[in-house]
């Protein structure tokens, strides 16, 4: 370690207010770049640690610069599988879960690297409990998957206070925030080791399955909705409901559910296409099952209809005759 690095560490330890707080660009362009180039003296203030062999509350002890809520490390981003594309991010008691997308770090108009945010969860995915430990992973632009990265570890001091307040207010968050009982104390460490002892392989495998499943849920759902058979059944059902009486309340419920599904999946169909689908569906299914089925003949009049028609014609004739006689009588009386 150089004299400048030793002096920086000594100053930060002795004098309050002196902090090591580099920007994202400085971490990538200066520290990570010089570390990769082999200039160890310029980056001696940052320790090289295999982060995923430690729990987050144990990492502050491995840092060269002591702090209360922020620490820095160099780490090789290993592969989860020899020929896989996923990184190894599981520890003995939990796993680091990536949140959001990988963001670009720019120096002016030039992209110098990428930044990814990870949150530590205790337990197995997808039922892990989120903690206040957050890590930002910085990588040089265009580096391979298993390249060296620099990590900024942070402890969210407001996490426990906000979780306690929301529990008192009766609010349960969707992401399952649970206040971490760990810390830097030995008693809390023993609690995690006794209650959350989990093999690394199981955590890595379950985390991999959940991430892959989450990435493909939307695509699978969209492919199912775009299937021609399901489209035909859906449109035929809607059209058939328009031709038979239904309970108004039930009809409103079906209509609201159908409209919500269409708005969610982005399916837009015109009324003409609906009627065409229904006609094809009826011809294919009804005609296929009953060979004697034919379209009704509008000119074929039943016997009951002909009798009713004759009665109507006779009644009309009698009414016109009475009306004509009345007017004829009035006309003769005036003359």
From Swiss-Prot:
Q: What induces it?
A: By high salt stress. Repressed by gibberellic acid (GA), but induced by the GA biosynthetic inhibitor paclabutrazol (PAC). Accumulates transiently in seeds upon imbibition. Induced by drought stress.
Question: What are the GO BP annotations of this UniProt entry?
Answer: cellular response to salt stress; flower development; gibberellic acid mediated signaling pathway; membrane protein proteolysis; negative regulation of gibberellic acid mediated signaling pathway; photoperiodism, flowering; positive regulation of DNA-templated transcription; regulation of trichome morphogenesis
Which residues mediate DNA binding here? 112-162
Q: What if the gene is knocked out? A: In ntl8-1, no discernible phenotypic changes except slight differences in lateral root growth and flowering time, as well as reduced lateral root growth rate. Insensitive to high salt.
**Its membrane topology, per UniProt?**
Single-pass membrane protein
Q: Which Pfam families match?
A: NAM
Please tell me whether the keyword Transcription regulation is annotated for this protein.
Answer: yes
Q: Which PANTHER family match?
A: NAC DOMAIN-CONTAINING PROTEIN 86-LIKE, PROTEIN CUP-SHAPED COTYLEDON 2-RELATED
**Name of the featured protein:** NAC domain-containing protein 40
Q: What is the lineage of its organism?
A: Eukaryota, Viridiplantae, Streptophyta, Embryophyta, Tracheophyta
């Amino acid at each position: 370690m150089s004299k400048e690095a030793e002096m920086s560490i000594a100053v930060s330890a002795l004098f309050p207010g002196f902090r090591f707080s580099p920007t994202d660009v400085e971490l990538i362009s200066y520290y990570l770049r010089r570390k990769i180039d082999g200039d160890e003296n310029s980056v001696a203030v940052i320790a090289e640690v295999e982060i995923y062999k430690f729990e987050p509350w144990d990492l502050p002890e491995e840092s060269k610069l002591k702090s209360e809520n922020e620490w820095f490390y160099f780490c090789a981003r290993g592969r989860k599988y020899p020929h896989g594309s996923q990184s190894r991010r599981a520890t003995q008691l939990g796993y680091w879960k990536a949140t959001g997308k990988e963001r670009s770090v720019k120096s002016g108009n030039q992209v110098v690297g990428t930044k990814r945010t990870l949150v530590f969860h205790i337990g197995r995915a997808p039922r892990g409990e989120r903690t206040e430990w957050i890590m930002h992973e910085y990588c040089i632009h265009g580096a391979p998957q298993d390249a060296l990265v620099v990590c900024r570890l942070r402890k969210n001091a407001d996490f426990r206070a906000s979780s306690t307040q929301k529990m008192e207010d009766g609010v349960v968050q969707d992401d399952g925030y649970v206040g971490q009982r760990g810390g830097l104390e030995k008693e809390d460490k023993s609690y995690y080791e006794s209650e959350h002892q989990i093999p690394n392989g199981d955590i890595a495998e379950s985390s991999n399955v959940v991430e892959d499943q989450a990435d493909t849920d939307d695509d699978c759902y969209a492919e199912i909705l775009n299937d021609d058979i399901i489209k035909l059944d859906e449109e035929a059902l809607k059209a058939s409901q328009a031709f038979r009486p239904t309970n108004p309340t039930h009809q409103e419920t079906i209509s609201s559910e159908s409209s919500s599904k269409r708005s969610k999946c982005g399916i837009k169909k015109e009324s003409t296409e609906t009627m065409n689908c229904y006609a094809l569906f009826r011809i294919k299914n009804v005609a296929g099952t009953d060979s004697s089925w034919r379209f009704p003949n509008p000119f074929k009049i039943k016997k009951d209809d002909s009798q009713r028609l004759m009665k109507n014609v006779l009644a009309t004739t009698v009414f016109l005759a009475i009306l004509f006689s009345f007017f004829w009588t009035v006309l003769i009386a005036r003359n």
